[in-house]
């Protein structure tokens, strides 16, 4: 009986504390906030921004099996390999030249390159506004523009004419996407 009363009191106290919270949000003033431009005006951080663009090339949808399938298996430079019952997602279609635009390898290559282009456009947006050493700034901008050209080269090589995006876009703007 005593445990039941204690348990009931515990439940009532818990409900009281949970239901009697503040109604207003806690507003905290940022004292040491660093803007993105302050952060990037440090040369080491600007280099890290460009390294983030290079890093995109390590993603699975850049130069992995989807890319090999589109460039080597379809041209007979390579075979799907394995056993006939192992489809390798859509690689058996590429090996037989019966693939379609909705196959996963095509969307991987397409999405991977445009994700890289998105990164390059964001990097260029910030790099062009920085106040770092002009030689370093020009080098970083040239590296990022090269990577964007490489991504477009891959897209044109696989798909022909593609939409060209050369400025930073707001991914929340549904009209652009």
Which role fits each region the language model picked out?
Residues 1-30:
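Bacterial Sec-dependent N-terminal signal peptides
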Residues 22-74, 99:
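Membrane-proximal, proline-rich intrinsically disordered regions
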Residues 1, 22-24, 53, 120, ...:
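Terminal processing/anchoring signals of secreted or surface-associated proteins
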Residues 47, 55-59, 84-159, 173-176:
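Conserved, well-structured interaction surfaces
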